[in-house]
UniProtKB/Swiss-Prot annotation:
Disulfide bonds join 30-54, 44-87, 68-102, 188-258. SMART domains: HormR. This is Corticotropin-releasing factor receptor 1. GO terms for molecular function: corticotrophin-releasing factor receptor activity; corticotropin-releasing hormone binding; corticotropin-releasing hormone receptor activity; G protein-coupled peptide receptor activity. It comes from Ovis aries (Sheep). Glycans are attached at residues 38, 45, 51, 78, 90, 98.
Length: 415
């Protein structure tokens, strides 16, 4: 351990020596360029800037163009571009050197790292926007008691599941350092289990959405007989034993790295991924049947309930592919092509992080019942405040001189 600081010091001294040798060679090269050039009159002397670019002897008032350096501090640059510097009219070099066109040539590893950082930013931005929209939608469903029915309670629980999933995503990102991954402590495994549980609940609540619509539209079963506890058992209850079984499998067969990722040849993750794919496929079948019925039997129907079903189906038609595409992308190999891999990373990051935003928009903000209830509340608030204003104005009108106040009567009786 004691030798490492000494080695670092030796390396630093060697680099310093090499840099000074390189700088002296550049100065000599710059002077030789200046001697070779024939410049008469007022001129700028040969100079090497901080980036190591040689600016040869040049006439005053001229913009000097020099190619970018091949290497600078170990970084390779594109030499087809140029740097610019002005030789001022008084024969001195301008302090500012324009190297904006000199772009570094990144290796494949550096490019992948840059794309990864951009994908992380997209993920953070998307999850922040999604969480904000989901919280607003949650509060609206909480406050608007007039629209509470089984259908909207399912929407509300789906939004709650997405809130919890987004919240645990932030916990994972902020706590799971490489050191924690390697230590495989108990709390980090619990965080992973919680994140996967809420991930599964998203799919089972989407299954609840499809199940409700299929029961109401295809089976023509009275929705009044449907109870919210049935859907609560499906959405929150069924995923729990699935995750418990997955956690037991991880504990015995793949107990490393906080249960993130998987060991080659171990398929414990399919314990929870399998049911997710299954309910996704069932939902696609439900949607196919629902759309078929709506297109044939209920096309001419104009009842308010049928209109609500159509709107719910439209929202589900949009959201289910969004949920499904992001999960099916997990099994897709983007290939070795650089462009396809970059597109895959960005596309998956965008859809994965903005899912909650789309759910809140389609099931809450564009929900006609929610919007109607908000308008009614707004009108009631306006009416209430206008009545208060009228009462306040009436109370502020001065009393007539002919009226006698109680205070004056009391004074006269006292006399």
């Amino acid at each position: 351990m004691g030798r490492r600081p000494q080695l670092r010091l030796v390396k630093a001294l060697l680099l310093l020596g090499l840099n000074s040798i390189s700088a002296s060679l550049q100065d000599q090269h710059c002077e030789s360029l200046s001697l070779a050039s024939n410049v008469s009159g007022l001129q700028c002397n040969a100079s090497v800037d901080l980036n190591g670019t040689c600016w040869p002897q040049s006439p005053a008032g001229q913009l000097v163009v020099r190619p970018c350096l091949v290497f600078f501090y170990g970084v390779r640059y594109n030499t087809t571009s140029n740097g610019y510097r002005v030789c001022l009219a008084n024969g001195t070099w301008a302090a500012r050197v324009n190297h904006s066109e000199c772009q570094e040539i990144l290796s494949e590893g550096e490019k992948s790292k840059a794309h990864y950082h951009i994908a992380v930013i997209i993920n953070y931005l998307g999850h922040c926007i999604s969480l904000a929209a989901l919280l607003v939608a949650f509060v609206l469903f909480l406050r608007l008691r007039s629209i509470r029915c089984v259908r909207n309670i399912i929407h509300w629980n789906l939004i709650s599941a997405f809130i919890l999933r987004n919240a645990t995503w932030f916990v994972v990102q902020l706590t799971m350092s490489p050191e924690v991954h390697q230590s495989n402590v108990g709390w980090c495994r619990l965080v992973t289990a919680a994140y996967n549980y809420f991930h599964v609940t998203n799919f089972f609540w989407m299954f609840g959405e499809g199940c409700y619509l299929h029961t109401a539209v295809v089976l023509t079963y009275s929705t009044d007989r449907l109870r919210k506890w049935m859907f609560i058992c499906i959405g929150w209850g069924v995923p729990f034993p699935i995750i418990v079984a997955w956690a037991i499998g991880k504990l015995y067969y793949d107990n490393e790295k906080c249960w993130f990722g998987k060991r080659p040849g171990v398929y414990t993750d399919y314990i929870y991924q399998g049911p997710m794919i299954l309910v996704l496929l069932i939902n696609f079948i439900f949607l196919f049947n629902i759309v078929r019925i709506l297109m044939t039997k209920l096309r001419a129907s104009t009842t308010s309930e049928t209109i609500q079903y159509r709107k719910a189906v439209k929202a589900t038609l949009v959201l289910l592919p969004l949920l499904g595409i992001t999960y099916m992308l997990f099994f897709v190999n983007p290939g070795e092509d650089e462009v396809s891999r970059v597109v895959f990373i960005y596309f998956n990051s965008f859809l994965e992080s903005f899912q909650g935003f789309f759910v809140s928009v389609f099931y809450c903000f564009l929900n006609s019942e929610v919007r109607s209830a908000i308008r009614k509340r707004w009108h009631r608030w306006q009416d209430k405040h206008s009545i208060r204003a009228r009462v306040a104005r009436a109370m502020s009108i001065p009393t007539s001189p002919t009226r006698v106040s109680f205070h004056s009567i009391k004074q006269s009786t006292a006399v």
